[in-house]
Curated annotation (Swiss-Prot):
Lineage top rank: taxon: Eukaryota
Regulation: The enzyme activity is specifically activated by double-stranded RNA (dsRNA). Recognizes long dsRNA (>30 bp) with no preference for 5' RNA phosphorylation.
Catalysed transformations (reactions): GTP + ATP = 3',2'-cGAMP + 2 diphosphate; GTP + ATP = pppA(2'-5')pG + diphosphate; pppA(2'-5')pG = 3',2'-cGAMP + diphosphate
Family, as annotated: Belongs to the mab-21 family.
Name of the protein: Cyclic GMP-AMP synthase-like receptor 1
One GO molecular-function entry: 3',2'-cyclic GMP-AMP synthase activity
Requisite cofactors: Mg(2+); Mn(2+)
UniProt entry keywords in alphabetical sequence: Antiviral defense, ATP-binding, GTP-binding, Immunity, Innate immunity, Magnesium, Manganese, Metal-binding, Nucleotide-binding, Nucleotidyltransferase, RNA-binding, Transferase
Pfam families documented for this protein: Mab-21 (PF03281), Mab-21_C (PF20266)
GO biological process: cellular response to virus; cGAS/STING signaling pathway; defense response to virus; immune response involved in response to exogenous dsRNA; innate immune response
Entry's EC annotation: 2.7.7.-
């Protein structure tokens, strides 16, 4: 499918072409006014960079763990250039690499779709006799189970202690450009989150990630093709819900591969930003950013490359419909398969009432935009404004 076509007799004879362009102009103006973060980007980025460098350097000096740190990757909405409204959330993968890291035996977790188990047996056999790696071996002894499987909760407990020590050393504050900002630390899922209060107010999720090579990937053949020539992927110590003691299950994360898949698709990212902004404005927090990203990842592999040359407005409208279909409970229950393991339905965790609320909103939004796309009227500008602006008229 290379182009999006709306079935309307008015459209077929071209009589409403000017009106259609007017809706597009309205959406483009809303994008420039409410969605883009360009005017706020520099001060927040400067502040974030200072905090990132300080925390990373403190982690680097934190004994054995510091020897495992091998750089970081800005990910999430900001890293993907999908952040909307304000640059007030940053997601940072902190890469951990063990000695003999390529000897980690990775297995799919049969009891948790989308997760993997990291068997450290061969790693520990090799480094156990190496004097220079004795500190790492001793650390591993504390964070693996009897089967030598790495434990999420033990690793996170260690990192939580290190982050607490880091903030204490910093006095729970940081000075940037002569101004003091106060810092608060909370453990949020897999992330070690710092909330910044000061001239720039934002949060940073420091997410630990065991960096693994392409040779260690455990994917079905089709998903392996989507992984392509990507060199690395990560295993994230994401706690179970409810929390589980001695948890050997890690969430597989393919951020680098996803970034490659989203790259160079003309209107893809603008359309994602429109959908995220609408979600934010309407307070539909049960729809996560990764849900939206996943919806588009599936379209990347299903649509012809020329599809993304359609306008962001047209793609946005079509994705509203696909999202609503995925959320529907009747007549057939929809689903949003995890891109890297389609057996996992990412909407399965939502209650029926949450799904119904999201479905009703996005189906109504789709209807409104499709109607306005074929018949711009006095209400159209207000509809566009209310869809993307937190300020009411």
């Amino acid at each position: 499918m290379s182009s999006i076509r709306y079935h309307s007799s008015a459209f077929d004879d071209g009589s409403f072409s000017v009106m259609a362009r007017n809706l597009e102009n309205m959406v483009n103006r809303a994008n420039a006014q409410y969605v883009k973060i360009d005017k706020h980007r520099e001060p927040y980025t400067v502040h974030y960079n200072a905090l990132r460098d300080k925390v990373y350097s403190e982690w680097k000096e934190s004994g054995v763990l510091g020897t495992l740190l091998k750089g970081s990757t800005l990910c999430g909405g900001y890293g993907d250039k999908l952040k909307v409204s304000m640059p007030d959330e940053f997601d940072l993968l902190i890469h951990l690499v063990f000695p003999e890291n390529d000897k980690i035996i990775v297995k799919a977790d049969a009891s948790k779709k989308g997760n993997v188990i990291l068997d450290m047996t061969k790693v520990m056999e090799i480094i156990g006799s190496q004097e220079h790696n004795k500190p790492v071996f001793d650390l591993l002894q504390k964070i693996v189970n009897k089967k030598k499987q790495l434990l999420e909760d033990k690793l996170n407990s260690l990192l939580q202690s290190i982050m607490t020590q880091t903030l204490n050393k910093m006095g729970n504050q940081i000075e940037v450009a002569g101004r003091i900002s106060h810092l608060e630390y909370k453990k949020c899922g897999p992330a070690h989150t710092i909330f910044v209060k000061g001239p720039c107010e934002y949060s940073v999720d420091f997410v630990p990630a065991i960096r693994l090579s392409a040779a260690q990937v455990v994917l079905a053949p089709e998903q392996r093709r989507h992984f392509g020539g990507t060199l690395y992927w990560d295993a994230i110590p994401k706690p179970m819900k409810p929390a589980k003691t001695d948890n050997a299950s890690f969430r597989a994360s393919f951020y680098e591969a996803e970034r490659s898949l989203l790259l160079g698709k003309q209107s893809l990212k603008p359309a994602i930003r429109l959908l995220k902004q609408n979600r934010n404005v309407k307070n539909k927090a049960n729809l996560k950013s990764y849900h939206i990203k996943t919806l588009f990842l599936w379209q990347v592999v299903q649509q012809d490359a020329s599809y993304w040359s359609n306008s962001p407005k047209d793609i946005f409208i079509e994705m509203l419909g696909k999202l609503a279909d995925s959320l529907a409970l009747t007549p057939k229950k929809g689903k949003l398969p995890f891109f890297w393991d389609p057996k996992l339905d990412m909407f399965a965790e939502l209650t029926d009432s949450q799904r119904t609320d999201l479905f009703n909103h996005f189906r109504k939004c789709e209807y409104t935009f499709r109607k306005d796309n074929g018949n711009v009227n006095d209400c159209t500008e207000n509809n566009v404004h209310s869809s993307f602006s937190i300020n009411t008229r």
